[in-house]
């Protein structure tokens, strides 16, 4: 069989670790976490499957290897918690994108001192180099085992699984219900850090037991961990909630409700500029503007399938004994626009666009500033086309996304998400849609990965993942294929043959949630938004009251040039005014003293530390305007806010 790219003769009953050790150098094998046969990950202590023809090592620095390390570290943490707090009950502890967590049921809150003690105990267990062992038990034996341990949550999980057998992993004195796989020994888990404690509900149900979730992170080596912890500290400084207050952009008031944003004047202006930019770009690309109501009759949501598949995330109200659903998506109104008149094949594609306000019931525990909210605005479009136009429409949207993300300086990558367990539509439709999405990306030469089972319930999708300045990944743009809703709403067009035909539809967003995108952009830039998007592009700072009259003249001049400017003529020291403007992330400060008044000029200071110095009003305006226009010229675009 093939082992790590080599042809080896493997004896029946050989262990994965033994076989890989023979195929690899000592240095290489030291970094092997688990083995892989096909799509299946295997413990190194597992016997090589009889039908395995290609065994590969999973290295510690790979994506899959990192997930295993983090999952194993979650078990290590649970072992330490049970040692120090024997009455704590364990629930679940998976790896996540940034690390891992484990949820515990314990009678008092865990403190920062507790986390330090848990970490110290984890390090002792690492030093002991305990083995991770896997045991397959009948469900009856597993129930007996966890009943003796008093682990009620594990008992519930076993009962819900309904399997004849389950696997249990043991490290040291700790046993856990788990599919695995895990590292061979705790000695491999040397680079970890416990980060915080948060509340959680058992199985995400707010009506069930409240638990304590300990978050942590782990890496293959201390250097990678140190880099990540430095990024966490930088992220705290860039937290968009902190910047939102500092820059006076938005607030979330408990009197209004959780997950609902109040936009202040400067924040509302940022939104208005973004939306204006998007409207103009959509017009250039042949989109038509539409707008639908906030609430629609429940029967429409039943017809679309949302009521059966999405109602737990929706809000409902009753008017005149008629049930209405507050829209979580904008697609239904757009389809009714298409259906409002007879369409010819010559009319297609139809591209409908709306900045639509939607409401979704997100659980309170996941709400987070602008990044996770209950009411938000989507830059939502639906492209209804002939099947032969589908690939070109996907390519057009993907290029649109690339232009916009390039404008903001984001690197991005694509993921194709395939059919989930809970889905509507035939396998044939899903296969056709998935092939169209992948084919478009291949035609563009865009690399992509497959995200199995993560499509929406009504169709596969392309997610565009952007990477910010802290190397965090965010999903913003989505291109989603849908053969199902045109069928449910009986959409049709008259073909060249004079017969009725069914169109196909793309759901798509570019920025996604406007709120979320602004939150991501604030953290990406640390609040120093590009000049074109800054609510105030220049601040005029006077040295004394004697310059106030000229400052107003400068203000009027800049505004006539289309530059958003303010005057700070308070009776404060210049240094104080400069520091405050820097905290407000103003792109340009224009200082006016007696010398500048006499020369009818300004002294320009840039946010990035450059000091252009004394400039005439025309020169200063030209300098600022060039900075505003530069990102658009770089991308072959043009824009002015109006």
Curated annotation (Swiss-Prot):
SUPFAM superfamilies: Class II aaRS ABD-related, Class II aaRS and biotin synthetases, ThrRS/AlaRS common domain. Binds 1 zinc ion per subunit. Residues 1-58 form the TGS domain. It is found in: Cytoplasm. Its main location: cytoplasm. It catalyses: tRNA(Thr) + L-threonine + ATP = L-threonyl-tRNA(Thr) + AMP + diphosphate + H(+). Residues 239-530 are annotated as: Catalytic. The keyword Coiled coil does not apply. Its EC number is 6.1.1.3. Disulfide bonds: none annotated. It holds the Pfam family tRNA_SAD. Catalyzes the attachment of threonine to tRNA(Thr) in a two-step reaction: L-threonine is first activated by ATP to form Thr-AMP and then transferred to the acceptor end of tRNA(Thr). Also edits incorrectly charged L-seryl-tRNA(Thr). Homodimer. This is Threonine--tRNA ligase. It comes from Maridesulfovibrio salexigens (strain ATCC 14822 / DSM 2638 / NCIMB 8403 / VKM B-1763) (Desulfovibrio salexigens). The lineage of its organism: Bacteria, Pseudomonadati, Thermodesulfobacteriota, Desulfovibrionia, Desulfovibrionales. The gene is thrS.
